[in-house]
Design a protein with these regions (language model features):
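Metal-ion/cofactor- or nucleotide/acyl-coenzyme-handling active-site neighborhoods
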Residues: 1-206
Length: 206
């Protein structure tokens, strides 16, 4: 499969990059509240609160949605009829689940955007980090000034994808000088191009 995949987390670093423009360049896997404004090729949502929000709309009827099954969904026939369920359920966060889905579908080159991991530093000494999510302060999300969740699980789940799919080349797009977790500091099948390099490669603007 020559086509590339784009896997979108919701970290602030991808703000301004339109998923619709990426759909013209490859297959887009995106997460959670993206559904409010866009229709990626695949929407991945594993949090029950987010899935129940999505169930209030007809999004799943007209678009591809991937999730973990939960008994709470038995009252929502639309979800039962139209969602593709992870088998077995990974118990992972949405972003790494989307990344693994792209790998399992056979993509050999995957661009990862919005996987920032680290929160937004509140002070120069970086003693505290606040939520880093473009949907902060909206329904089913923390407030923007809430303390960031520790990213260790997200990073380890990402690393598991890299280890399990060694024939896939991963490109984690970050701002120049952006945060690189020590757990992802190897060169075997991942690199960290800058946002500007990514935009230039695909002839995109933000």
């Amino acid at each position: 499969m020559a086509e590339v995949a784009f896997v979108l987390g919701n970290g602030q670093s991808r703000k301004g990059i339109d998923p619709n423009n990426l759909k013209e360049k490859g297959t887009v896997f995106a997460c959670n509240a993206v559904y409010r404004t866009h229709q990626p090729h695949w929407l991945v949502a594993v949090d029950p609160k987010m899935m129940l929000e999505i169930a209030e709309t007809d999004y799943v009827v007209h678009n591809k949605v991937y999730s973990n099954y939960n008994r709470q969904y038995e009252k929502h026939q639309k979800l039962l009829d139209h969602v593709t369920w992870s088998k077995p359920s990974l118990g992972w966060s949405s972003g790494p689940t989307a990344l693994r889905l792209a790998c399992e579908q056979g993509f050999k080159e995957i661009y990862i955007l919005g996987f920032d991991y680290q929160g937004l530093a509140v002070d120069a000494n970086k003693n505290r980090f606040n939520l880093n999510n473009i949907y902060g302060h909206t329904r089913n999300y923390k407030r923007s000034n809430d303390q960031a969740t520790f990213f260790g699980n997200w990073m380890n789940q990402t690393k598991k994808c890299l280890q399990d799919f060694k024939d896939v080349q991963f490109h984690r797009v970050i701002p120049a000088g952006g945060y690189q977790p020590k757990g992802l500091e190897w060169k075997d099948n991942i690199d960290h191009p800058s946002t500007e390099e990514f935009l230039e490669k695909f002839n995109l603007t933000r």
